Amino acid sequence: MKYLTPGPIQLPKDVLNHIKNQPYFHRSSEFKEIFSSVIEKMEKIVGEEVLILPGTGTFSIDTMVYNYVNPNEDVILIDIGEFSRRLGESLISRNVKLHIIKSEIGDVVTPDIIEDYSKKINDLKAIAMVHNETSLGVANRYIEKIQDLAKSLNAILLVDSVSGIPAERISKNIDVIATASHKAFMSIPGASIIFYSIKPRNFDKLPPSMNLNKFIDMKKRLETPYTPPINVIMGLDYSTNYILKVGIDKYAEIHKERTDYLRNLVKLKPVAKEKFGSNTVSAFYTNNTKAIIESLKNKGYTIASGMGNLSNSIIRIGVMGDVSLDDVKKVAEVINNYD
């Protein structure tokens, strides 16, 4: 079975070979050597400092929220889909004053709309957004302008890019980005990853497992406060080598090439507006979600259905990982048997 899913992805065999090895003791010099290498390469790929925690993409989001906003602070949420709403759930659990700007399905919210809305708020502390909305295959490519806007408003920008970076590139430093190991970084699930250009600003005590200041302090000694996801990091050691060998820009271009090929072949209507179509995950409208998924399974391919209210009316296809243009063609051929 080959996985063209939004994640976990189809892993290259070389990544799997690295992951299956005996885990190092996390206080050993052998682990520190790999940990140092992975940190250096990830920071080179994204251009910001990185922290690696045990967890998932969701835990990465929660950790970002709890370290960078405080109860009763005003926060704008840009809602472009299901994972935007999950980001909102995390913010609500933090007891912030949440202001939501919602887009139409397949579209994004532009910086001018956010700027106009912000004038209603006296003391805005943060803007929170999803960079690459996995549920709909939508990429918000205004992210750099939104970062500039946040700075001009004396607020910070919190970004969920779990299915985005480094395949869906960001061209400038963002205040905080939450992501994970099992999508475009091409490892297995198990690592919450946070890139940051500003230090945590929480005013209260946090659970030890999500206190980023602990991780920042121990990173200086190439250690983590608690047992890290060792084999995930071993996989990242190989995958980051691969990304840098291919080239950071070329790696993103490869995903765009696969996605463009897919969209040109598939006859169904894409969910995303053309200029906001994600380069890692594509979504298409269909009345035959279950039949398409079952037919592809019989051909040796797994794709995903929609989420929430769209679970039976769209399909989602990921092109991250070990996916060839031939795989894309075969998947499209099956899909095109259905209206």
Task: Explain the meaning of each model-derived region.
Residues 313-339:
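PLP-dependent enzyme catalytic core of the Aspartate aminotransferase-like
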Residues 109-161, 165-166:
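Active-site phosphate-binding strand-loop segment of PLP-dependent enzymes
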Residues 1-28:
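N-terminal "arm"/small-domain region of PLP-dependent enzymes with the aminotransferase-like
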Residues 37-45, 240-272, 295:
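Conserved PLP-dependent catalytic core of the aminotransferase class-I/II
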Residues 10-11, 182-261:
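Active-site C-terminal subdomain of aminotransferase-like
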Residues 69-123:
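PLP-dependent aminotransferase-like
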Residues 18-63, 67, 82, 86, ...:
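Conserved N-terminal alpha-helix of the aminotransferase class I/II PLP-enzyme fold
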Residues 270-296:
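Conserved PLP-binding catalytic core of the aspartate aminotransferase-like
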